[in-house]
C-alpha cells in the first residue's frame, strides 16, 4: 500500500514522504491515527506544496533566529532579583525558565517562549551567576549569563 506520511513516524519517514507499507500496517495503524493518507496524484501534489512551504519557512526561521541570537547576546548578562533568598545564598524556591524569560524581556531582550530556555539544571536554587542557553532554532543557540541576586 502506498501512503504519504502526514507526521513523522519512527523508522519510516517524516511528513511528506511517500512510503510503501504492508496493507495491515497502513489500514490498522497509520490511517486511523492520521499519520498518513492514501497516495493519489492530488495528495502527492498537496504533499509537494507542503514540503516547499516548510522549506521556505525553515529559511525564514533561521534568519529570524540569527537576529534573535544577536539581540540576546548583546545583553551579555541579565540580572534577576529574587525576594526569597537565605543568608547563605540558597533560594527558598527556585528560578524557572519562565522567570528567566521575564528577566530577559525586562532587560530589553526579545519576547521568548519558556520552552526555548535551557537551564544548567532543572531549576536554579542559589544566588550567583549561572550560564543560560536559549534554543532559537535547531542550528542556532544563544548563550548568556543570568545573575541571580537576593532582593
UniProtKB/Swiss-Prot annotation:
Keyword annotations for this protein, in alphabetical order, are:
Ribonucleoprotein, Ribosomal protein, RNA-binding, rRNA-binding
Lineage per the UniProt record: Bacteria, Bacillati, Actinomycetota, Actinomycetes, Mycobacteriales
The free-text function statement in the UniProt record for this protein reads:
Binds to the 23S rRNA.
| Family that this chain belongs to | Belongs to the bacterial ribosomal protein bL9 family.
Name a GO molecular-function annotation.
Answer: rRNA binding
> Which PROSITE patterns does the UniProt entry name for this protein?
RIBOSOMAL_L9
Put simply, this protein is called Large ribosomal subunit protein bL9
User: Which GO BP terms sit in this record?
Assistant: translation
Q: Name one Pfam family in it.
A: Ribosomal_L9_C
Residue pairs linked by disulfide bridges in the UniProt entry: none
Q: Which N-terminal residues, if any, form the signal peptide?
A: none
Instruction: Please provide one cellular component term from the Gene Ontology annotations of this protein.
Output: ribonucleoprotein complex
Q: Which InterPro entries does this entry report, sorted A to Z?
A: Ribosomal_bL9 (IPR000244), Ribosomal_bL9/RNase_H1_N (IPR009027), Ribosomal_bL9_bac/chp (IPR020594), Ribosomal_bL9_C (IPR020069), Ribosomal_bL9_C_sf (IPR036791), Ribosomal_bL9_N (IPR020070), Ribosomal_bL9_N_sf (IPR036935)
Q: Which organism is this protein's natural source? A: Mycolicibacterium gilvum (strain PYR-GCK)
Protein's UniProt keywords contain rRNA-binding: yes
Record's keyword annotation contains Transit peptide? no
Amino acid at each position: 500500500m502506498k501512503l504519504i506520511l502526514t507526521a513523522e513516524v519512527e523508522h519510516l519517514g517524516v511528513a511528506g514522504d511517500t512510503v510503501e507499507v504492508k496493507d495491515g500496517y497502513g489500514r490498522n495503524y497509520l490511517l486511523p491515527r492520521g499519520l498518513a493518507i492514501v497516495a493519489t496524484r492530488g495528495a502527492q501534489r498537496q504533499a509537494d506544496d507542503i514540503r516547499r512551504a516548510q522549506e521556505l519557512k525553515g529559511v525564514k526561521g533561521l534568519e529570524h533566529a540569527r537576529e534573535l541570537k544577536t539581540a540576546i547576546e548583546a545583553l551579555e548578562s541579565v540580572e534577576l532579583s529574587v525576594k526569597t533568598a537565605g543568608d547563605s545564598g540558597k533560594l527558598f524556591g527556585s528560578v524557572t525558565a519562565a522567570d528567566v524569560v521575564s528577566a530577559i524581556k525586562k532587560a530589553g531582550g526579545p519576547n521568548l517562549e519558556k520552552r526555548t530556555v535551557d537551564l544548567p539544571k532543572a531549576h536554579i536554587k542559589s544566588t550567583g551567576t549561572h550560564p543560560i542557553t536559549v534554543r532559537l532554532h535547531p542550528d542556532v543557540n544563544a548563550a548568556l549569563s543570568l545573575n541571580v541576586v537576593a532582593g
